[in-house]
Amino acid sequence: CWFQGANMVEHLTVLIVGCVAREHTISSAYERSPHVKRIVVAPGNDFIAYGRQKEVITDGNCSLKDPMSILEIARKYEPDLIDVAQDDALGAGTVDLLQESGFLAFGPTQAAARIESNKRWSREFMKRNGIPHPNFRYFDSEKDGINYVKELYSRYPHRLIYVKASGLAAGKGALRSENLEQAIRNIGRMREFPDGAGDVFLVEEGLIGEEFSYYAISDGATYRIFKSAQDSKTVFNFDEGDQTGGMGSVSPAMVTSPIAEEIDSKLIKTAIKGIGEEKLPYTGILYL
């Protein structure tokens, strides 16, 4: 156990990597632990340290896309545990660098984090392992993508599809298309995403139904499901407008037991098993 021997109340320092409401919530959970004395959130934000019962520090002298800058923060505060929560930091290999430098870091490695940071790899992983997924094609050419959607809409004029950036796009990378004009426009928008997130993009079948997600915590071999959630993915009510991050969620989601069992067996169990068989054990929180 990572706090084995830490029998004193208020003993540990925890570093949380991230800067938004997620990290605020995570820091509040650590604050309730009798084992935690001090919490550092990097880069954090001004509100995170407000009105706290324990010492909560924010340190903005780092970039989430620069693992070395986060390592410097870790060396400064010498935390007992580092919780790497943010997508960009995981995708950049922050956990790998921290672990190689002797720190106890919670989160997936850069290779395992591709299940979120590289949508092309993620869909191919699902296909290899028989995990249910929408039909998809990926492209690195705007022209090829446009030719494909022209052919698709010539056969299915009212098809719902999503044009999706393969890389990390702050929750904004999936663009809904209900006709050819929208699809062509959304393919053109792929070049607007920073850091080349849309250099490779997917054209995916749109699925109709109730959307929700499950959280599982895994050590790379075993796992436990502990939460479900239904998040608001679009800017406006009633699923209108572009997708974005930070619009809030409801937890737990209203899911019947048979569906929950199916999610466990067909999605989470299969994903943990498959990623382990590919020698990329996933440790941390898996959100499917």
Regions found by a protein language model. Name each.
Residues 5-110:
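ATP-binding N-terminal substructure of ATP-dependent carboxylate-amine bond-forming enzymes
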Residues 16, 41-42, 83-84, 105-108, ...:
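General beta-strand structural signal in soluble alpha/beta enzymes
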Residues 49-52, 114-120, 236-238:
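Short, charged, surface-exposed secondary-structure boundary motifs
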Residues 57-65, 137-141, 177:
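Short acidic-hydrophobic, aromatic-tinged amphipathic segments that line or gate anion-handling sites
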Residues 106-173:
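A conserved helix-loop-beta module that forms one wall/lid of the active-site cleft
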Residues 173-288:
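Internal nucleotide-binding/catalytic subdomain
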